[in-house]
């Protein structure tokens, strides 16, 4: 069905084709808001550049083809940088159904065996890395959907190396702990997402992620072999240990009883925590190490996904037609897709039709049929 080959990126009707992929990626690099991003805009770009530098020729050929990258290593890095931030800016569902995919709330007193229980229904970062990388490796993908799958893998591997994306002290991964510091951050999680990475960049260069990436590659070059891909659960556990030791314990934050599904926002410290110069210097070093590991491991994962170069039959051509969107006026008789989780429905060209996770979709023949089952139209569907 033609609709399955379409991937909507924006809140309008932006339909990705090979002809406009580069424009989409360029706009993502220039206009993306920093505050919304895990690891921050620059953190994800650093991971992507390191990974691009360490891909095998076989893996690089597939990545370049899927992302429509410009020629050369620099073009590949630019495309991966831009793709790395899309899951935070353009692939969000209207009802935020994908929000839980970016982290796993492991309690500070959890054991390694508790990981499965912290990922209900496979809706967490570890499960999604496994799911999307497997789909890419299976090879039975439509090239248009592969763009989204690859962007998610690039992004999620970065996320899982941010320590507070794999830890919670009944505080939503540090989101409930205000900070007292010279850096611009409202809470501990935000401090680790962006300002700490920016400090790291300015300590190396004038705030350029590409330069920072190359510096980190050299600094941790001896660890590159050791940082081959390991199961996502193992990485989550490793990041959790970093959070325990270098964030919570270092700041003398008490350990709260395990409450991973808590709706309330608790500050276990009972006060704003001070991030002084000594702590920030230590945090810069830890963040740099985590970003380097993420980049090396992302490259290792993609090298495992694609061990053979892309074949000519798999190479997209500029003449490949892009499917035309179905007009909203035809929605009453077109395909209606509902989100089981949010009970919202949409149709091609409106709402979150092409952003709904495949395993979360239900198809209805008409709008009336959807509404009879208790579904409501997405806000921007007329």
Indicate where each model-derived feature is located.
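Bulky hydrophobic/aromatic "packing anchor" residues in well-ordered structure
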Residues: 27, 103, 345-346
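N-terminal, motif-rich segments that launch catalysis or mediate targeting to/interaction with membranes
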Residues: 37-156, 163-292, 296-314
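Sec-dependent signal peptide recognition
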Residues: 18-25
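Short stretches within intrinsically disordered, low-complexity N-terminal or propeptide regions
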Residues: 4-5, 30, 320
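N-terminal signal peptide c-region/cleavage motif recognized by signal peptidases
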Residues: 33-35
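Mature, structured domains enriched in cysteine- and short glycine motifs
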Residues: 315-382
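Acidic, Ala/Val/Gly-enriched low-complexity intrinsically disordered segments
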Residues: 2-4, 13
């Amino acid at each position: 069905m033609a609709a399955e080959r379409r991937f909507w990126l924006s809140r309008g009707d932006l339909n990705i084709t090979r002809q406009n992929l580069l424009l989409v990626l360029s706009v993502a690099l220039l206009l993306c808001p920093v505050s919304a991003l895990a690891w921050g805009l620059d953190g994800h770009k650093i991971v992507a550049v390191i990974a691009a530098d360490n891909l095998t020729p076989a893996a690089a050929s597939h990545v370049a083809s899927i992302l429509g990258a410009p020629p050369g290593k620099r073009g590949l890095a630019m495309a991966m940088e831009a793709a790395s931030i899309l899951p935070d800016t353009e692939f969000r569902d209207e009802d935020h159904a994908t929000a839980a995919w970016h982290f796993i709330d492991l309690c500070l007193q959890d054991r390694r065996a508790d990981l499965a229980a912290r990922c209900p229904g496979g809706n967490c970062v570890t499960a999604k890395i496994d799911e999307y990388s497997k789909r890419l490796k299976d090879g039975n993908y439509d090239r248009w959907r592969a763009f989204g799958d690859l962007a998610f893998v690039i992004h999620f591997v970065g996320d899982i190396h941010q320590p507070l994306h794999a830890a919670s002290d009944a505080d939503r991964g540090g989101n409930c702990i205000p900070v007292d510091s010279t850096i611009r951050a409202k809470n501990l999680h935000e401090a680790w997402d962006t300002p700490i990475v920016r400090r790291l960049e300015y300590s190396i260069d004038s705030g350029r992620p590409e330069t920072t990436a190359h510096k980190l590659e050299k600094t941790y070059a001896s660890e590159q072999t050791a940082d081959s891909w390991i199961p996502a659960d193992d990485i989550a556990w490793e990041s959790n240990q970093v959070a325990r030791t270098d964030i919570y314990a270092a700041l003398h934050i008490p350990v709260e009883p395990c409450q991973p599904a808590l709706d309330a926002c608790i500050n276990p410290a009972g006060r704003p925590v001070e991030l002084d110069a000594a702590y920030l210097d230590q945090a810069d070093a830890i963040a740099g190490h985590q970003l380097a590991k993420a980049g090396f491991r992302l490259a290792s994962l993609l090298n495992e996904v694609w061990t053979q170069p892309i074949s000519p039959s798999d190479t997209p051509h500029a003449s490949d037609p892009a499917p035309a969107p179905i007009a909203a006026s035809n929605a009453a008789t077109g395909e209606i897709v509902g989100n089981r989780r949010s009970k919202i429905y949409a149709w091609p060209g409106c709402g979150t039709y092409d952003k709904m996770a495949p395993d979360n979709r239900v198809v209805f023949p008409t709008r009336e049929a959807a509404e009879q089952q208790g579904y409501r139209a997405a806000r921007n569907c007329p």
